[in-house]
Amino acid sequence: LLQLLGSQNDMATIRLGKDRQYRKSISSLFPESRRPSGLRKTRVSYNSLAHRTTWLRSDLEDVQQGDALIVFTKRAVLDIAGRLEASGRKASVVYGSLPPEIRRRQIKLFTEGKTKVVVSTDAIGMGLNLPVRRIVFMQTDKFDGKSRRPLNVSEVKQIAGRAGRYGMYDTGYVNAMGGEALDYIRAQFENTEPKISRVSLGFPHVLLDMAEPLNTILKIWKSVEPEPPFEKISIDEILFLYERAYKAREDIDGFEDKHTLYRMLTCSIDIKNRDIVWLWLYYCQTYTADICLDFPTLEMCTDAGLMKYETYYKMLDLYHQFSNRIGKNMDVERLELEREKTEDRIMRYLVRDKKNYIQKCKYCGRTLPLGYEFRVCDQCFAASRNRKGRSR
């Protein structure tokens, strides 16, 4: 939180919840700044953050109350939660695409003891206050949008730091599934975090005043290599949306207005969700038709089950975001009502039996091993190869 006070004699205050590397960076930007004594608080000392000497078994039998199991995909979260509940252990779930209110409700179930375990992606390290006794890394690598890579020191420490809670679990524990994974997590946790050597650089809005078309400006900006320590924030999603808008440019009023177009292109949406991209483009084409945008409906979602309601919630967010960016009136009362109804539906899906989310072979229906990367079991894959061999 950056609190800027109006008077020149007042001092600006920055409250940081990050590690020492971030505080050093802020101090270097504001050399006259100081940290008031007595304000820094720690929930649990890293010295008391202990590692288990034995790793978690793949059958999940030694999962304990107060555990947080960490994976890095929504699919894996629901799979593990389903396996736990199949053995009689209720689990809360947390992942990035869940609406904030649903995360809070899931965490409330955990804090009140109605669920014994929480299964989460790395979203658990983002400001959630949990009574977690033990963090268990079920995976030690993640897909970062470009490639699959091992967790780095900062990521391990950010997640591991959720273990322990002052006055309840004074000692936090960190574990992993498998000896090799535990050795890796221990090594990363004991490593020193690298110094912050890069500063993120966003797209300069002043470039929108140039005479060139927006796509030319964006491509030129993407090709520029800034000098260290600056590193450009990716504009790949903006370019993706520009391509979609360009194909429909004849139906978009004010397409040549770079400032308006840029506000539309920078809507924060899930570009991997075809329904969300469709609705975004529809708003681009129809935003001048009335004082309000068309309100999204559940029938616009082509998914089914839980995914359908998660997509609809994203549509409601897009309606709110696009309206604000373009200056359209909103049906606020209806928006709040639809959000509440959708949150309730999502919560019902997550509270009900999760065994349907356990990953099974798409041919024979056998339960796949925990962490299995494929949709077909070894037996069916081998049988398929044998049939192909005989047909030759």
Which residues make up each language-model segment?
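Post-DEXD/H (motif II) to motif III coupling segment of the RecA-like Helicase ATP-binding lobe
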Residues: 1-44
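Conserved two-lobed SF2 helicase motor
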Residues: 110-129
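Conserved strand-helix element at the start of the C-terminal RecA-like helicase core
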Residues: 11-13, 62-87, 91-94, 231
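Conserved helicase motor
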Residues: 73-75, 93-105, 121-125
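Conserved RecA-like helicase motor-core motifs
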Residues: 36, 42-43, 88-100
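Conserved segment of the helicase C-terminal RecA-like domain
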Residues: 134, 141-144, 149-190
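Short glycine-/polar-rich loops that comprise or flank the Walker A/P-loop
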Residues: 8-11, 31, 39-40, 64-66, ...
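Non-catalytic terminal extensions of ATP-dependent helicases
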Residues: 204-392
